[in-house]
From Swiss-Prot:
Coiled coil: none
This protein's name: Large ribosomal subunit protein uL2
Organism listed in the record: Methylobacterium sp. (strain 4-46)
UniProt entry tagged with the keyword Isomerase: no
Family statement: Belongs to the universal ribosomal protein uL2 family.
Region (Disordered): 223-278
Matches recorded under HAMAP family: Ribosomal_uL2_B (MF_01320_B)
Keywords noted in UniProt: Ribonucleoprotein, Ribosomal protein, RNA-binding, rRNA-binding
Length: 278
């Protein structure tokens, strides 16, 4: 889909660049595949703010997207339509399966209404088809990749994202992610062929603060603009640079500080995403 720009008849339209969604389905989602979503506003069960600068925004309905692709394995599905989903950057596709049953899946690039998709142990290497990643040839572009067998896709799910198979060894597949990281994934984990739809999402410009508010994002205050009681960077006479290395409001280093602590899965990372930056 293309990008839309506007004549600058108002200040916000001058900078506005959005994705043209005129080809998407304009009706409501399938009721059986949706459920209500309660906005937390960044609060936890105690009502305390755990994520700052969240709240408000348009009310949303949660679409139940099939990330596992195992329930209708072996059944050929037909893409009924491509829909907008407010809960993610990618588009979703409504698939109807022979013998009955419908599901939403992440819409891959170049998949349109009327196309046929299928999942199973051995299926064609065609965008939208899902199968164990160990059965795909080296060089295949994939998305919605499982990290645990049967748990559902976890890698490469956002708009325009994909991973590439670069090797196979001893039941594991080596994937190259968009970040530059190379990672081992078990060969029985499912993945979907192709790249995720809406690659132009990276080029949008919201044009005004209010459009960010519609998405549920509140103003992000800088620490150097606060008082000393509110932030380690706060205070000082006149404008200051903060006077120290960047830290969070609680004093922990930020802006580049490594926070990964999951040593249990370090063995699956063949090449770190930080290596290419050196």
């Amino acid at each position: 889909m293309a990008l839309k720009t506007f004549k600058p008849v108002t200040p916000s339209l001058r900078q506005l660049v959005i994705v043209d969604r005129s080809e998407l389905y304009k009706g409501k989602p399938v009721k059986a595949l949706t459920e209500g979503k309660i906005s937390s506003g960044g609060r936890n069960n105690l009502g305390r703010v755990t994520v700052r600068f969240r709240g408000g925004g348009h009310k949303r309905t949660l679409r139940n997207v099939d990330f596992k692709r195992r329930e209708f394995a072996g059944k050929v599905g037909t893409v009924e339509r491509i829909e907008y989903d407010p809960n993610r950057t990618a588009f979703i596709a409504l698939v109807s399966y022979e013998g009955g049953g419908q599901s939403y899946i992440l819409a891959p690039q170049r998949v349109k209404a009327g196309d046929r998709v299928v999942s199973g142990e051995q299926v064609d290497i065609k965008p939208g088809n899902a199968m164990p990643i160990g059965n795909m040839p080296v060089g295949t572009i994939v998305h919605n990749v499982e990290l645990k067998i049967g748990k559902g896709g976890a890698l490469a799910r956002s708009a325009g994202n994909y991973a590439q198979i670069v090797g196979r060894d001893q039941g594991y597949v080596t994937l190259r992610l968009n970040s530059g990281e190379q990672r081992l994934v078990h060969g029985q984990c499912y993945a979907t062929v192709g790249a995720v739809s809406n690659p132009d999402h990276m080029n949008i410009s919201l044009g005004k603060a209010g459009r960010k508010r519609w998405l549920g994002r509140r103003p992000h205050n800088r620490g150097v603009a606060m008082n000393p009681i509110d932030h380690p960077h706060g205070g000082g006479e006149g404008r200051t640079s903060g006077g120290r290395h960047p830290v969070t409001p609680w004093g922990f280093p930020t802006k580049g500080k490594k926070t990964r602590s999951n040593k249990r899965t370090d063995t699956f990372i063949v090449s770190s995403r930080h290596n290419r930056k050196k």
